Amino acid sequence: MEGLKDKTLQELEEMQNDPEAIARLALESPEVQDLQLEREMALATNRSLAEQNLEFQGPLEISRSNLSDKYQELRKLVERCQEQKAKLEKFSSALQPGTLLDLLQIEGMKIEEESEAMAEKFLEGEVPLETFLESFSSMRTLLHLRRVRVEKLQDVVRRPRALPELAGDVPPKRPPPPRPVPQATPPETEEQPPQPSVVTPYPLPYSPSPGLPVGPTAQGALQPAPFPVVAQPSSYGGPLGPYPSPHPGPRAMVGYSWSPQRSGPPQPGYPTAPTSTSGPGYPLVGGRTPGPGYPQQSPYLPSGNKPPYPTQPQLPGFPGQPQPPVPPQPPYPPGTTPSYGFHPPGPAWPRY
């Protein structure tokens, strides 16, 4: 179209009346030139592809012939497989446990009938003894063998057989259900042990020595009074055996018995009796001067060596003491008399 700008009106009219000029002008346009170029490129590409296809023609023909041959072989193998399968079914049907069981039962019945017929002939005298023994023993042996086989086959037939499951017929196994995730539990706080409550000690509502009779109630404050002096072995050092001391406290000195002055503070809940400067202890052997911890004569003892308050009967069992009129009731079960120094299991003194 760029060349039409320079032409005059007369030239344009002449070109309009000339079809060759119009065709030449159309062929010289850039759009037509691009189309022609694309056409030539497509033709060249098709030509190269055709040449490549021609190169593959030989191997393709050879492969086609090989495929035809393999297909013919496959058809022959299929026919042969069908024949072998038919033979296998024929043989397997004859070897089924049920079929074999029927055949063995029939053969067993036949051999049994033959053996019975042989026995009848022998009884009638038609068969000699030697022939009868040989044939009859072999027939009966075969009969028993077949009976055993029949019984075994019957067990096999009755027993359920676990047939192998085909992989295609078995449905896929379901995955196991997901297990619930245990929730995290908060750590349990350790329980603190209960604090011991402080209880005010109070006197016991019962007598510490239930085996002794209860005396009259004292009125007013009790005055201290000594215990009577009785004989005691000089080698006595305290109760024997694995029994704990009545009151926890520091151990007494060697050679002295227990006394309230050397013991610890009284335990709460147990009533204690007022003591003098020298607490009650075990009496000394006659003639020995009392030391610390042994009973001494009180300066406040009234006339007649009698305490000003009612007393209870003394504990029986110590040598040298008068027996009370009340029958003794020991704090331990009656039985063999314990040795000297035996520590009773219960409280012996009503005031300790």
Curated annotation (Swiss-Prot):
InterPro entries with a match to the protein in the record: ESCRT_assembly_dom, Helix_hairpin_bin_sf, Mod_r
Molecular functions per Gene Ontology: calcium-dependent protein binding
Coiled-coil boundaries: none
Domain VPS37 C-terminal residues, every copy: 78-167
Biological source species: Mus musculus
Gene this chain is encoded by: Vps37c
Domain of life: Eukaryota
List of residues that carry Phosphoserine: S29
Membrane topology label: Peripheral membrane protein
Broad class of the protein's primary localization: membrane
The protein's name in its UniProt record: Vacuolar protein sorting-associated protein 37C
GO biological process, one term: protein transport
Pfam families: Mod_r
Stated family: Belongs to the VPS37 family.
GO cellular component: cilium; ESCRT I complex; Golgi apparatus; late endosome membrane; nucleoplasm
Modifications the protein undergoes after translation, according to the UniProt entry: Phosphorylated by TBK1.
Binding partners and assembly: Component of the ESCRT-I complex (endosomal sorting complex required for transport I) which consists of TSG101, VPS28, a VPS37 protein (VPS37A to -D) and MVB12A or MVB12B in a 1:1:1:1 stoichiometry. Interacts with TSG101, VPS28, MVB12A and MVB12B. Component of the ESCRT-I complex (endosomal sorting complex required for transport I) which consists of TSG101, VPS28, a VPS37 protein (VPS37A to -D) and UBAP1 in a 1:1:1:1 stoichiometry. Interacts with HGS and STAM2. Interacts with CEP55.
SUPFAM superfamilies assigned to the protein according to its UniProt record, in alphabetical order: Endosomal sorting complex assembly domain
Role this protein plays: Component of the ESCRT-I complex, a regulator of vesicular trafficking process. Required for the sorting of endocytic ubiquitinated cargos into multivesicular bodies. May be involved in cell growth and differentiation.
UniProt subcellular location: Late endosome membrane
Keyword field: Endosome, Membrane, Phosphoprotein, Protein transport, Transport
Region (Disordered): 162-352
Biased composition range(s): Pro residues: 173-185, 202-213, 319-336
